[in-house]
Amino acid sequence: QGRGYTVKEYKKEYNKSNHDEYEKPPIYNFEMHVELYHKIYDTFNEKYADVKQRLIPDAEVPYRLHFTPEDFYVFVIAHAYKHYSSSGTGIRTLADIHIMNQKLGGTMNWEYVDSELRGLGIFSYERESRELAQKLFGIAELPTKANLSETEQQMLAYYLGASTYGTIENLTLNKMRKLQPDGGAITVHTKRKYLLSRIFPGREWCKAYAPTVYKYPVLLPFFWVWRLAVKGVKRRDIAKQELEAIKRER
């Protein structure tokens, strides 16, 4: 606070997540993490739970630690995929991937990188994003439908439509798709299941977002009532966007 920072407006609280967000006009925004991934991201959380063991000492500043280029690249891809697979992430992510490959691609141990990406289940995502980024930023001419495959066109449209921090529609649809067992069109049953999970979140959800309720599960029914009465009013605009996304999906 002495440096002019305040807790991000929409939270008005801290120590309630895996990171605290601080803002300072006109543009500064810092996220101070206590852990790199929520526990709901099982694979990523397990990988980076003890991140210090993956860091190496800096050659110039003895008290500073950092990733190797390979581990840095893998972490950035994992972080990008976390957003991509939930609410989405903007085209800036493709620019980041392209620049990293320009600067680091020629010296990285790709056998190690690919092994790490496969272990995290994001090998295909990295390859497809890297190839798309190369077509967008690696040539002087603007890309056309002629040199983008149908899959690449769809992927680009998803990136372009995600704004900077993703959209509620993407988040809602991606969550419903994860609930759809056969990977097909989202059914009425899946929509109902999703709505129930949003109105009555389970104990595992509370582990990340309501730790006190997770610790004392007897509070869960009271939490549901409070969530509907308080959050339902405060965040009614978001709830409306979710409902509209559910209705549009056929």
Language model: regions and residue ranges:
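Conserved NTP-donor binding/palm subdomain of two-metal-ion nucleotidyltransferases/polymerases, i.e.
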Residues: 2-250
